[in-house]
Amino acid sequence: MPQILKEEIKNRIYKAAAKIFYEKGFLKTKMKDISEEAKIPVGLVYTYYKNKEELFDEIINPIYYYLNLAIEKEEKEEGSALERFKATGEEYVLKLLNQHKSLVILMDKAQGTKHENAKQVFIKILENHIRRQVQKKGIIVEEEILIHILASNFTESLLEIARHYENPDWAKKILNLVTKCYYEGVNSI
């Protein structure tokens, strides 16, 4: 089979799986559903992916990549939290939001996979990021729960943008409003 055809079939499987996982979640999705959406025999799906979990992982892996890259790049920057975010973090968060369906699949549709606690993992990653930045600035946080609340609120904000995603410009506009509130307070809008 020519390489172009193989890639085209794999791409059809990927798109079909993303659509079905987004609609039904991991638990209710069958490989037969994916093959029907891709308009190929179910056996051909198994030629490209050994099981549903492998296909699911391929769809959601970019989310972890962009989250970790955003944090890594932002932590190398100098300046205020907002300046650091604008300098580098925003670019990667927008890339993450461009994968909005994958983000929703990971956070809302992963029950039955090794990723079913992804939202809590995401929050923990952000908590550690906030904690490192607070320590770097020598700030003492009176109540540790504040760091959790900030991380949780930011995570939920990103998820709401992903769940209601309209287009890249809209996502950037809403992300700018959210980060302005997040870093400067509600009175800043």
Each PLM stretch: what is its role?
Residues 1-6:
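N-terminal intrinsically disordered/low-complexity leader segments
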Residues 12, 16, 20-54, 58:
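Helix-turn-helix
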Residues 31, 61-68:
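Short, basic, alpha-helical segments at the C-terminal edge of helix-turn-helix-like DNA-binding modules
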Residues 57-63, 106, 115-118:
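Alpha-helical DNA-contacting segments of helix-turn-helix folds
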Residues 68, 87, 94, 98, ...:
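Amphipathic alpha-helical packing segments from all-alpha helical-bundle domains
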Residues 91-113, 160:
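Amphipathic alpha-helical segments used for helix-helix packing
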